Amino acid sequence: GSIATIKGHIEGDEGFNGIANITVRDARELVTCRMNDANEPEGAKSAFTFYDRSKTIYTGNDSIRAGQFAFTFAVPKDISYSDATGLINLHAISTDRKTSANGWCDRFVANGSDINDNDSIGPSIYCYLNSPSFSNGDRVNPTPYFVARITDQNGINAAGSGIGHDLQLIIDGDMQHTYNLNENFSYDFGSYTSGSTFYALPELAPGQHRLLFRAWDVYNNPSTTELTFTVVKGLKPNLFSISCTNNPAHTSTTFIVNHDRMGSNVNVAIDVFDMSGRHLWTHSENGVSEGSAYTVNWNLTLDNGATLQTGVYLYRVRIGSDGSAMTSKAKKLVVVRQ
């Protein structure tokens, strides 16, 4: 593994401040498809080939200040060692989210790495299902969301170039339930020593299960961790907190629902009452929660078409998932009309 630092700038905008999303890919490789076209005569069959950059060396984010940026990443031992050029893709967004920029560079090769014989320790791994509050042996829903936090002082190997050196998740020791999590891995902001990967598990049968997760550092030192868990059909979600972006609200607000069903289909229902208990507004929707927070926008218009006036109100949020019963919390909403 080697440590590389890349510097650059936003062309024509010296005052640009924001965030750069960076992906560094290895050299192109020839990919040969399987000859599985049953309609093609046996003698005429020929494998389709194409070139692709299928191996990612680094994916992360870093800051841009006054149009200038720099990012550092670890080059794993598992690179192609080709004289062909690699590729850097960048996407930038300004702090005020009004301006974006894109760029790429292929004027470099990744065909060597330093060897550190002193590093024989694999990365540290912390993993959980659905929520960081998960404890080994806990109950989960049939489609739990797996997250692994990985740290290593020399960097993490998520390139997928070496045979067997993938970020790998195995359920119940079953090869049919073995998943490659390289593409889901991303380094923490401004870091090449810590990051995370994730996976939304397919529906599992009720009962006890075991998972094993394996990760490698850039010197190909492995680490593994295991979790046991019990799948319970119809298990209620954990509703950690509810809040509003504008409280007091003037013309609109956004309800924020924090829960433990990342990557799952959720059913969210919101009701608003006045302080005497009179029901004023209701809303329900289904959707996939990509993170641990589900948001619902509201323009303060009631069911009868009227506008919510200045006052103190009560809102109740209910959430369910995968056909489970609903969990609820309630809070106050203050409206101040201007």
Question: For each predicted feature, which ranges?
Answer:
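Short, conserved beta-strand segments of beta-strand-rich sandwich/propeller modules, principally
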Residues: 85-89, 145, 208-212, 254, ...
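Beta-strand-rich binding/interaction modules
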Residues: 3-37, 162, 265-272
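C-terminal tail/sorting-segment detector
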Residues: 227-228, 232, 245, 255, ...
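Aromatic/hydrophobic beta-strand junction motif of beta-rich domains
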Residues: 4-12, 146-152, 253-261, 298
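Long, low-complexity serine/threonine/glycine- and acidic-rich segments characteristic of extracellular
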Residues: 23-111, 126-133, 147-233, 286-291
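Short, surface-exposed loop/turn motifs with a glycine/proline- and acidic-biased composition
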Residues: 201, 205-208, 285-324
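Short, compositionally biased P/S/T/A/G/V-rich stretches that sit at domain boundaries
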Residues: 1-5, 9-11, 111-144, 151, ...
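Glycine-centered coil/turn sites that cap beta-strands in beta-rich domains
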Residues: 232-274, 284-285, 295-298, 319-324
